[in-house]
Swiss-Prot record:
Biased composition (Low complexity): 110-123, 130-149
Protein name per the record: Uncharacterized protein R727
Primary localization: virion
Location of the region described as Disordered in the Swiss-Prot/TrEMBL record: 110-176
Organism: Acanthamoeba polyphaga mimivirus
Length: 284
């Protein structure tokens, strides 16, 4: 085809059947200028960036930045980033963007970061994060995220499980312990018994707990008991002598002194206090 051939720029890096991001793919150029001095089969409008053979960046063999056929990203053979064989950054086959086999992350064979067995990110066997066998973080069954929870089982640092252990059961290793140290200590070994709380112990405990003076507490208790006994004697006196409550306090006390055989001296003030509080309010 003379003036009806395909624009080489529209063929992309992989020939006329592969459209590598070129919107002009398949378009026919109808007005090629063949009178350009030194015409070599391509229009000068191909420009220094897009010339398939002799542009300053797209030379067929020795372009300073391009591979044999393509631009700096799409060279099919020897591009510095996408060469299928000897790219300086890629594995055996592919480029970092379009290489079919060995990109820097997914190369299956010889990529510097995508080795077949021990690649650090995506190697199928020994990646540090996802390798099921020999990854540095995920061993065969002990990965902290994907393992079967060894880090959370109730095991001791030596691997022994003490979740259901009995403190009275001893391992066979205990038979090897040297007991000579214990044999040197001679004393009576006490046996535990349930502690019995006596009243005396309880009283002492409460006195200490609340910071009370024992003597003061004892005197207070004795006084209260004495007052209770006085009230009981006076109550008997008025029950046995119901008519005496209509007499004066002096006459009541004279009779009381003769009546009282309790052995406790009760003053007239005690009798009057009891009369005013317990007897007089109930008189009719």
């Amino acid at each position: 085809m003379n003036n009806m051939d395909y624009d080489p720029r529209s063929m992309g890096s992989y020939g006329p059947n592969y459209n590598n991001f070129n919107p002009n793919f398949g378009k026919i150029r109808r007005h090629k200028n063949t009178s350009y001095p030194g015409y070599n089969g391509f229009d000068p409008s191909d420009g220094p960036m897009n010339g398939p053979m002799g542009g300053p960046m797209g030379g067929p063999m020795n372009g300073p930045m391009n591979g044999q056929m393509g631009g700096p990203m799409n060279g099919s053979m020897n591009g510095p980033m996408n060469g299928p064989m000897n790219g300086p950054m890629n594995g055996q086959m592919g480029g970092p963007m379009n290489g079919p086999m060995g990109g820097p992350i997914n190369g299956p064979m010889n990529g510097p970061r995508g080795r077949q067995m021990n690649g650090p990110n995506n190697g199928p066997m020994g990646g540090p994060m996802n390798g099921p066998m020999n990854g540095p973080n995920n061993n065969q069954f002990n990965g902290p995220m994907n393992g079967p929870n060894e880090y959370y089982s109730p095991e001791d640092s030596d691997g022994s499980d003490y979740s259901d252990s009995n403190p009275n059961e001893f391992d066979s290793d205990d038979d090897d312990i040297d007991l000579s140290y214990f044999q040197k200590r001679q004393y009576d070994k006490p046996t535990y018994h349930k502690f019995e709380v006596t009243d005396e112990y309880l009283a002492d405990y409460l006195l200490r707990k609340f910071g009370l003076d024992k003597d003061k507490v004892v005197r207070s208790i004795q006084k209260n008991k004495k007052d209770e006994f006085k009230a009981m004697i006076l109550n008997y006196f008025y029950k046995e002598n119901p008519k005496i409550k209509h007499q004066s306090i002096n006459n009541q006390y004279k009779l009381f002194r003769k009546w009282n055989k309790s052995g406790l001296k009760i003053k007239i003030d005690d009798l009057e206090t009891y009369y005013e509080n317990k007897v007089k309010p109930h008189m009719h």
